[in-house]
Design a protein with these regions (language model features):
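Sec-dependent N-terminal signal peptides
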Residues: 4-16
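Sec/Tat signal peptide C-region and signal peptidase I cleavage site
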Residues: 16-22
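Residue-level recognition of short, well-ordered coil/turn positions
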Residues: 17, 40-41, 96
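Short N-proximal segments of mature Sec-exported proteins
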Residues: 27-90, 110
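Substrate-binding/catalytic groove segments of enzymes
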Residues: 59-66, 97-99, 118-119
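Cystatin/cathelin-like cysteine-protease inhibitor module
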Residues: 88, 92-93, 97-98
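C-terminal partner/receptor-binding element of secreted or periplasmic proteins
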Residues: 101-120
Length: 120
């Protein structure tokens, strides 16, 4: 009985190691550009809008105004969503060094350069 418990414990330990080595697939900038390029299918357009909106909304929701100065300041009236996405696609295509980087971070960097905050 003790041998069975030892074997089960060893299997449990090794299965945890196998799971710990699993890599998480992150959407690359090139993959996002491929989805956001026009003309886009309704599915691609929906994914592109959903992803970029979620990244921006997450930035807004998680930035604590007293602890972190804003780095994206969209002036009102804001430009059309399609205009911003089109500018992002152009930015990514002209900066191929970001093609394999995570799309969320590159999109935030683009937004920061496109909509900088006034320096005080």
């Amino acid at each position: 009985m003790k041998k069975v418990l030892v074997v089960l414990a060893a299997l449990a330990a090794f299965s945890g190691l196998a799971q710990a080595q699993e890599t998480i697939k992150v959407l690359s900038t090139q993959e996002l550009v491929n989805v956001c390029k026009l003309p886009a299918s309704p599915e691609s357009r929906s994914f592109c809008i959903g992803f970029t909106t979620a990244v921006y909304e997450t930035y807004l929701a998680t930035r604590h105004p007293q602890r972190a100065k804003p780095f994206i300041c969209v002036k009102q009236p804001a430009p059309a969503r399609d205009e911003v996405i089109g500018d992002f696609v152009k930015f990514a295509q002209s900066n191929q060094q970001v093609a394999e980087k995570p799309a969320a971070g590159v999109f935030l960097g683009f937004m920061a350069s496109r909509f900088p905050c006034a320096r005080k």
